[in-house]
């Protein structure tokens, strides 16, 4: 179970970092845009668990639409 959780964490961290780089958004800018605290954004960027609400805010502000969410999170469609 821990191995699987670690894999998902790295996929999320990599996807978030890639999207931020594509858009030219820093962690502090993301914190300002989302209204989240800088420490919460840092937690998300480090691949640690964050709430669904936090993930929704990040997705909204990084302009990830529902059609590309699976690719963003590294999820293979079933």
Model feature map: region roles:
Residues 37, 48, 62, 76:
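The DNA-recognition helices of helix-turn-helix-type DNA-binding domains
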Residues 1-29:
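A short, Lys/Arg-rich alpha-helix, primarily the initiator
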Residues 22-43:
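Short alpha-helical DNA-recognition segment
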Residues 18, 32, 43, 57, ...:
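DNA-binding alpha-helical recognition surfaces that contact promoter or target DNA
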Residues 15, 26, 51-54, 68:
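Residues that mark the N-terminal boundary/hinge immediately upstream of a DNA-recognition element
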Residues 43, 47-60:
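Short, basic-rich loop-to-helix N-cap that marks the start of a DNA-contacting helix
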